[in-house]
Amino acid sequence: MVKAAAVVTHRRAQDTAAAIGELLTVARRAGVTLHLARDEAEKHALTAADGVAVAPELPTDVDLCFALGGDGTILTALRRYAGTGVPVFGVNYGEVGFLATIDPNGLAADFARAFAGEFDTISLPTISVGRPEGNWSALNDVSVHRKAGLRVADLAYALAGEEIGRVRCDGLVVATPQASTGPPLARL
């Protein structure tokens, strides 16, 4: 049962205004507190009130995160909650919505089911990138290119920390299953 949910939306408030209103109504009915970062609350002209908490940034101690937008918005939420165990529930307000859980039809019923915990979660694989400056994780893909002015890059790649190959090239794209169609389609 969900008691606290974070909310992240598309950068244009008008795209998700109706959905935010619906989410607030269903959340109040279910006794769920919605948590918004200050800039998100300002974007939607919301203030801390009954059922709404506003903080400088999103807390990680929530039960669920709603991401209302396109895949970019959903990726932002997934990055924020990576490694926390907080599931991200995506509502598609973008062009493709590959990462979205639902489309914006019948939101009240879908939000109510989400608050009741009536959803399955899936874990998405990530790619870990290691550099001397630190490590990063990528949910979709990693693109490595040669330095400007150099003819080719000499790249090594590893699986589970063990080097499995080297390649001399202009660049290399490594994609997870959920993003594997992006690089080829970008060439069309």
Each model region followed by its residue ranges:
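Catalytic core of DAGKc-family lipid kinases
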Residues: 94-170
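ATP/NTP phosphate-donor binding region
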Residues: 1-64, 76, 105-120, 131-136
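Short glycine/serine/threonine-rich phosphate/pyrophosphate-binding segments
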Residues: 16-17, 72-78, 180-186
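Gly/Ser-rich helix-loop-strand patches that form or flank binding pockets
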Residues: 81-91
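Short, ordered loop/turn segments at secondary-structure junctions
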Residues: 39-41, 71, 93-94
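AMP-binding/adenylate-forming core of the ANL superfamily
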Residues: 171-175
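Short, solvent-exposed amphipathic alpha-helical segments in soluble enzyme
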Residues: 21-26, 82-83, 188
